[in-house]
Amino acid sequence: MVIITTIVIVIMVATSAGKTRLKPHYGDGDDDRAYVPPDTGIDNDFLPDPKPLRIVTRNEWLASPPKEELTPLTLPVNKVIIAHTATEGCTTQSMCVFLTGHIQQFHMASDSKNFSDIAYNFLVGGEGNAYEGRGWESQGAHTKGFNRDSICIAFIGTFSSVEPSKAQLSAAQQLIALGVEENKLAKNYRLYGHRQLAPFESPGRALYKILQKWPHWANELSNNHWSDPEDQNSTRQ
């Protein structure tokens, strides 16, 4: 009888311990997701994909202030333009923060683009975060002739032959959905690849093919579009 009682007690203690054991909370202080080890790529995350959208604010990525007051947008806008930054990519928040700051410096430098601020409204990183550029309220400087009625989302990286990560694609889709929900984007907005409206390879051939399967895709070209020499199936105006 004593032996049986002892066994029952041991089983109860083990079961209770199993129920209360928690995974440790990891993080490097600038990422609010639980159980994400410092500086890991999104592919190694413990959370399911897609993860909830996180927008890293200008203050968080240490943005420089604009050189001058930015022109406000009239909301909701009717176009979403997807670009790529034509830089290296990033798979950790620390690297994405670094690249976002570097892109802003390049855009604002007097011996470079000499823009008032970073050109894009938002950027998305390979780790699945969105980064606030000019935001929802201000005109970008990304697509001449179309800045006043659009939001530009730039994928950090170069996607001529390599596709973005699932987390990066998800961040952009969630950001667009948020824009519609908050009346920043018209419910019947049109989605464009940067190359459709400007003579640039952006957003890269691989990403451009993916965009053509997204909702609200606009199968049209401006007079100043990019002509891809490798794409025999380009749409014609």
Give the ranges of each region predicted by the language model.
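Active-site acidic/histidine clusters and adjacent loop/turn architecture
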Residues: 74-111
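Basic/polar, cationic surfaces and motifs that engage anionic cell-wall
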Residues: 1-87, 125-237
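A general structural signal for stabilizing positions within well-ordered secondary structure
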Residues: 71, 113-114
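Alpha-helix termini
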Residues: 110-113, 182-183
